[in-house]
Amino acid sequence: MKWKGRKSSSNVEDRRGMSGGMIGGGIGGVGLIIYLIFTLLGGDPSILTGNTPNQQNNTYTGTTEEQEVADFVSVVLADTEVVWNEVFNEYGMDYEEPTLVLFTNSVQSACGVAGSSTGPFYCPGDQSLYIDLSFYDELSEKFQAPGDFAMAYVVAHEVGHHVQYLLGTSKQVQDLRGKVAETEYNRYLKRLELQADYYAGVWAHYVQDMDYLEEGDIEEALNAASAVGDDRIQEAAQGYVVPDSFTHGTSDQRIRWFYKGFEAGDLENGDTFKLSENEL
C-alpha cells in the first residue's frame, strides 16, 4: 500500500507504555456489548472485564519497526475517515469518526479491561478501536498472513464495526441476546462479522480508486480474512470444527464478503441478515 508521506489521522490516542490494570473480575453494563462487536481475530472475549483501574503513565520507547506500524495504521485510519465520510454523505448521513487507541499488554476501555491476547477490538461505549501493535507480528507469524495490507484489513474491519454501531445494526443484534437460542444468536453474530468484512471491502474499493493500492495488496487482505475464519482457527486449535459455534464465519465466507464489498463499494449489497445460511 502506498502510504508513506501521506496524511495521518488526528484521532489516534497513544497509550503504549501505560498500565491498563489487572485482568480479573466480571463484565457488566456496556462491556457486554463488546461480545457482539469486537473482533476476536484469535482472541478470547473472557479476557475482557468490567474493572475500572487507573491507567498510569510510563515512559515508552518503541522500536523503529513498531513506530512504522503505528504510523501506518494512523494513515489507514485517515483513509477510512475519508471513505466513510464520503459514503455517509452520499446517503445523507453524518459520519462520526472513531478513535484508534494504541496500547501494550493491557488497556482500559469503556467496555472493560482487555489484554493483548484479546486481539484488536472495537468498543461502542467510547466509539474506539483498540490495537496492540504486536498484533502485526502475530498476524504474520501465528496466522500466516503477512503484509501491510493484512493489517490494513484488520483496521478497516474494526472500523466496519463502528459503521454498524452508527447505523444501529449492532444494537439490533444486541437486543436479541437472551431472546433466541445460543446457536441462533451465533448466526446473527456471524452475520455481523461478515458485514464488517464487507465494509472493509468497501473501504478497499475506494482506496483503489484513490490509487493507493499496490500489487498484491488485495491478496494480503484476502489471506488475512481467510486466516481468521472460524473453521481455520478451530481446526488449528482443537483439530475439528463445530459449525454451530461459529460467530465470525468460515474462511471462505470472510473472503467472499470482503471481496463482495471491494467489488460493490456501497452499503446496499452488504445486508448479510436477509440471507439464509446457504447463501452466506
PLM features: residue spans?
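Long amphipathic alpha-helical segments used for membrane anchoring, targeting, substrate engagement
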Residues: 1-62
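Short helix/loop segments within enzyme catalytic domains
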Residues: 74-95, 187, 191-234
